Regions:
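Extreme N-terminal basic, low-complexity initiation segments
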Residues: 2-5
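Conserved short alpha-helical segments that host acidic/polar catalytic motifs at enzyme active sites
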Residues: 7-191
Length: 191
């Protein structure tokens, strides 16, 4: 076959049955993130479970869910498939809330150890935060070094924890979490 070099490669591929799709256009499984916000307190953990189950093809190394019930976080993460990590009894123990975020992991950075399961929960001077991330930072190494030199202690080998600490640093300087996230995005590179 011949290599198709076109920004509209799916269309070109369909037109040329002997075309070879460039490797950078192949599908890659790189984690899955699913979240729910509800105006009222609800069983958001079950909703998140089904969302993660649907995304499980994107990551089968670990799964995690964090439920926020008016600022009280209940979290559970472990290695394994969604249905193994969250049998009915464990899902019920997460309780109800109005915000939930979940993550299925496929290691692209860091190892596939349990400690790298997400979402990550961070306690800081102005509150708590749960973060789940799907992607890779291109300046993770530099940011991690900068953060460690300023006193941050890392518990994982993921670049997701780098993002969390950058957001926390910005949160200490800004009046809202939204502004902190906005400022943090200016410091990180990648996806």
């Amino acid at each position: 076959g011949r290599v198709v070099k076109d920004d509209t490669w799916p269309i070109c591929y369909a037109k040329h049955s002997n075309a070879v799709v460039p490797k950078e256009h192949h599908l890659h499984e790189e984690c899955g993130v699913f979240g729910v916000f509800s105006e009222a307190c609800a069983d958001v953990a079950s909703l998140d479970y089904y969302g993660l189950f649907a995304l499980q093809h994107r990551g089968q190394e670990s799964a995690g869910i964090v439920v926020n019930d008016d600022g009280v976080f209940t979290a559970y993460c472990d290695e394994g498939l969604v249905n193994d990590v969250f049998p009915k009894e464990r899902l019920q123990k997460l309780g109800t809330g109005n915000i939930v975020v979940g993550h299925v992991r496929y290691a692209t950075t860091g190892s596939d150890r349990k400690r790298n399961a997400q979402p990550i929960v961070i306690n800081h001077h102005k509150g708590r935060m749960a973060l789940a991330h799907n992607g890779n930072l291109t300046n993770s190494y530099e940011l991690r070094n900068e953060l460690e030199q300023s006193g941050s202690i890392f518990h994982t080998t993921t670049d997701s924890e780098v993002i969390a600490y950058i957001i926390v640093q910005e949160r200490l300087r800004t009046p809202s979490i939204e502004e902190a996230v906005y400022e943090a995005m200016g410091r990180i590179e990648g996806a």
